[in-house]
Each structure stands twice: as structure tokens, then as C-alpha cells.
């Protein structure tokens, strides 16, 4: 919690300049670099990575 107040962002993406305060946020961000879609609509072409 204190990282939010101190501005420390120790978790950094190896593919871009993104950094964040916790590993969970980094894991969510890493999905943006993949071509894997976790949600696909069966009725249209809508897809999301999250």
C-alpha cells in the first residue's frame, strides 16, 4: 500500500516503458502485448484480452 504514496513502481514491463506498483497490475498489462484473447463473443467479432 505504501508504494502508492511513495511513487515507487518496482514492477517494469520488459517490452515497453510501463511500470507499476504491484505484480498483478503488471500481469494484466502484459496481456496487451500478447495475441491471446480471453473473451470471444460467439455472436459477433468482439474479443477482449482481459
Swiss-Prot record:
Zn-finger region bounds: C2H2-type = 1-5, 11-33, 39-50
Location comes to: Nucleus
Gene3D superfamilies membership: Classic Zinc Finger (3.30.160.60)
The reply to whether Zinc-finger figures as a keyword in the UniProt entry is yes
Task: Output the GO biological process annotations, alphabetical, semicolon-separated.
Answer: segmentation
Alphabetic keyword roster:
Developmental protein, DNA-binding, Gap protein, Metal-binding, Nucleus, Repeat, Zinc, Zinc-finger
Q: Name one GO molecular function term.
A: DNA binding
Q: Which residues form a coiled coil?
A: none
Q: Name one GO cellular component term.
A: nucleus
Q: Which InterPro entries match?
A: Znf_C2H2_sf, Znf_C2H2_type
Q: Which family does it belong to?
A: Belongs to the hunchback C2H2-type zinc-finger protein family.
Functionally, this protein is described as follows:
Gap class segmentation protein that controls development of head structures.
Q: What is this protein called?
A: Protein hunchback
Could you tell me which species this protein originates from?
Answer: Psychoda cinerea
Q: What is the lineage of its organism?
A: Eukaryota, Metazoa, Ecdysozoa, Arthropoda, Hexapoda
